[in-house]
Curated annotation (Swiss-Prot):
InterPro entries: PFN, PFN_euk, PFN_sf, Profilin_CS. GO terms for cellular component: cell cortex; cytoskeleton. This is Profilin-3. Belongs to the profilin family. It is found in: Cytoplasm, Cytoskeleton.
């Protein structure tokens, strides 16, 4: 299965009648493995800052989490495993696996819990597969 298939069928899938606004799988070094059409252009320094927060939880809190031109307020996640952010009526969930970052961006009416479930379910699966 291609990485794009994981994005299209597992991240952008419908859940309770809702779906993510955008999603991507990004390598730890910043390379985009696959993304939805609507995913923002992420800069290398933004990926580096996200990876730093996984290594040093809390490092993003003072500045916020940036994805492309979007800025998210960092909210409670799981140190070293999941980063969550909020922006207006939407937000982002980022799950770290052995080799990649699974990123899901949502807006209302999708809920944070639905986004978390979609992103973390795929992230857990890929982690268990060694990715």
């Amino acid at each position: 299965m291609s990485w794009q298939t994981y994005v299209d069928e597992h991240l952008m899938c419908e859940i309770d009648g809702q779906h993510l606004t955008a999603a991507a799988i990004i390598g730890h070094e910043g390379g985009i493995w696959a993304q939805s059409d609507s995913f923002p252009q992420v800069k290398p320094e933004q990926t580096a800052a996200i990876m730093r927060d996984f290594a040093e939880p809390g490092s993003l809190a003072p500045t916020g989490l940036f994805l492309g031109d979007g800025k998210y307020m960092v909210i409670q996640g799981e140190p070293g495993a999941v980063i969550r952010g909020k922006k207006g009526s939407g937000g982002v969930t980022i799950k770290k696996t052995n080799m990649a970052l699974i990123v899901g961006i949502y807006d209302e009416p999708m809920t944070p819990g639905q986004c978390n479930m979609v992103v973390e379910r795929l992230g857990d699966y890929l982690y268990d597969q060694g990715f």
